Amino acid sequence: MSHVTLKNSYQSLSDRLNLFPQGAPPTELLFRILEVLFTKEEASLVALLPIKPFNVAAAAKIWQKPEAESRKILETLASKGMLLDMELRDEQIFVLPPPMAGFFEFSMMRMGNGYDQKLLAELYYQYLNVEEDFVKNLFAGGETQLGRTFVNEKALNSDNTLTVMDYERASEVIHTASHMGIGACYCRHKMQHLDKACDAPMDICMTFNGTAQSLIKHGHARQVDVKEGMDLLDQAQQHNLVQFGENVQNSVAFICNCCGCCCEAMLAAKRFAVLNPIATTNFLPKVSEEACNGCGKCVNVCPVEAMGLVSAGDPHNSKRRKARLDESLCLGCGVCVRACPESGLMLQARKQRVITPVTTAHRSVLMAIERGGLQDLIFDNQAHWNHRAMAAILGVILKLPPVKQIMASKQMKSRYLAHLMKPRNFVHLEH
């Protein structure tokens, strides 16, 4: 197949994926990835699907195919991890996930799943780690990020334990999820095919709730209970892995257990540090000048190179070193605190709390506004939005800070939206 034919075959699917708030810049590498994951027919059909959740009847109408045939196609795509499907109010609902966090990861969460995973690993590495456009927009395209850091709860002392909200705790996500699934770490699995993987645990990628339900159903993840989930969390923390999860308060879909050498989020944090590509915790480690002996263990375990060693300024020992934190780089994960053998580090609250979006819809609207794609989120030309769906989006917008509301209004160029955002016209639209 020539490059021109390939591009023509998958351009429409690429255009569809680029409508997600985090985007998916169309490049030759993306077309090659899509060719591995989708047949030509699948690509043409998926390109027509809406971004919002849909049922079989909606897909059948869009495709102009019988419902039975449409259901079979949708279930095949779900079995490949290219769609998510779940039961919602006794109805089977399908969702087209974004490339990340989405079907890129799903394609590598199960060993030997029918894909050429070595080829995918090579393509993903080039698209994410060599080319810059996609990963930069994914992690640093605006103020609101796709993922956030969870604090290592064992690094908290008795004082700051009381200030941690439930949604800031990975343990709370595990205890309250309706479903929990475990799959292979996409990042380390990818690096394994490139002979670049570290020795951190592989079978430790955590998915939750509806996402886990679908991945478990189709064999991309194995179901685990709370006890095993907590055991795996402890195992991850023993290996100094950082808990990086979906940047929402409610119904978290995933928590990755990240190393600093393989994982996309940590690599992005180092690559685009000044752009704050990952939402931090509400904590920062403080170095005790008295207790720190300059051993450097905190430097070695920091996944984003926020810790360094500098001269301790000891007039009696010119070689003595002490740890110094670069607060602008620090995620506040607490890995360094647990690694210190001298108890020379302690987590303290940041001066300003980090705001976490409440729901996926809330985060998606913020990301879309900041990345200039709100019109794509609302006016998805394949989706027939009902009043309830539109009201939910508008309800999120009307709860945003004034600056974000102005950005939304400018993007939409909507007199109706501008009228709604006048203080006297504020209404509660979500119910």
Q: Over which residues does each language-model region extend?
A:
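Flanking helices and flexible, charged tails adjoining ferredoxin-like Fe-S electron-transfer domains
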Residues: 318-322, 326-431
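A short, conserved structural fragment
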Residues: 78-89, 307-308, 345-346
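Short acidic, hydrophobic short linear motifs in intrinsically disordered regions
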Residues: 52-63
